[in-house]
């Protein structure tokens, strides 16, 4: 599967907060790291403080954990 920057992808890592959610590929690292694909999402995860806008809206994934949306 050829994933490129800007592509819409669905997350297939079951333990991920964003499992089965669709995000946009922000960057792809070609240096050989374990999780080279950075995916950006519209919503943030649960790590933000209560009552404050915040949280994380990006995460790294392996290509095998993604499918085209």
Swiss-Prot record:
Pfam family example for this protein?
PSI_PsaE
Q: Where in the cell is it found?
A: Cellular thylakoid membrane
Q: Which GO terms describe its biological process?
A: photosynthesis
> May I have one GO cellular component term?
photosystem I reaction center
Q: Which UniProt keywords apply?
A: Membrane, Photosynthesis, Photosystem I, Thylakoid
Its record classes its membrane topology as:
Peripheral membrane protein
This protein's superkingdom? Bacteria
Physiological role? Stabilizes the interaction between PsaC and the PSI core, assists the docking of the ferredoxin to PSI and interacts with ferredoxin-NADP oxidoreductase.
Question: Which NCBIfam families does UniProt cross-reference here?
Answer: PRK02749.1
Tell me the HAMAP family matching this sequence.
Answer: PSI_PsaE
Family membership, please give it: Belongs to the PsaE family.
- In its UniProt entry, what is this protein called? Photosystem I reaction center subunit IV
Organism for this UniProt entry: Synechococcus sp. (strain CC9902)
Organism phylogeny: Bacteria, Bacillati, Cyanobacteriota, Cyanophyceae, Synechococcales
Q: What gene is behind this protein? A: psaE
